[in-house]
Amino acid sequence: MSQITTWDEFPTVEYVKGVLRQTASGEKVMVTRIVYQGSVIIPEHSHEAEQIMLVVSGRLWSKVADEEKEVGPGSILVIPSNWVHAFRQLGDEDVVFYEAFAPIRLEYLVGFKGPDPSLAMMHKRFDETDESDRKV
C-alpha cells in the first residue's frame, strides 16, 4: 500500500456491536477512523497508549478521569496513558471520530492474534449486559 492513500483502502472491522473501525499504522503511532452506529456505550477502560480524539460528526457523552462532558463536531479529547475513560453515543445520528494512539495498539491491527486482557474485558462487559443496563 502506498504511503499516500485514502480510508477506502483500509478494511472496516466491527469490533463490538455498532462500532466500526479502520486503522492506519506506522511504527510508533496509529490513527483510526471510528463510526458509532446505534446506541453505543463504551464502558470505563484504560490502556497504555496515549489517545487523542477528534469528533467529526454526531454527539457523545464522554468521561475522562473525573471530567464528564458532552462533545460534538470539532471537539478534541486528549487522554493520557492509563487514564480511565468512557463514552456513550447521544441521539440517533452516527458518531464519526478519528483517534491517534502512541504507542500503537497491536490489538487494533487486522490479523493480530495476541491477547489483550483489557480489551477482552471491555468486550465481555459490553456483550453480557442488556442495553438498559449499559450505564457508564
Regions found by a protein language model. Give the residues of each.
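Short acidic-glycine-tyrosine-enriched beta hairpin
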Residues: 67-81
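Ligand-binding loop in jelly-roll beta-barrel domains
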Residues: 81-107
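Conserved short histidine dyad/triad with adjacent acidic residue
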Residues: 17, 32-46
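Glycine- and acidic-residue-biased ligand/ion/polar-headgroup-sensing regions
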Residues: 50-60
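A short, N-terminal "cap"/entry segment at the start of jelly-roll beta-barrel domains
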Residues: 1-28, 112-136
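Anionic, Ser/Thr-rich low-complexity intrinsically disordered regions
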Residues: 76, 97-98, 104-112, 122
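A generic "binding-loop/recognition-motif" signal
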Residues: 30, 38, 48-49, 67, ...
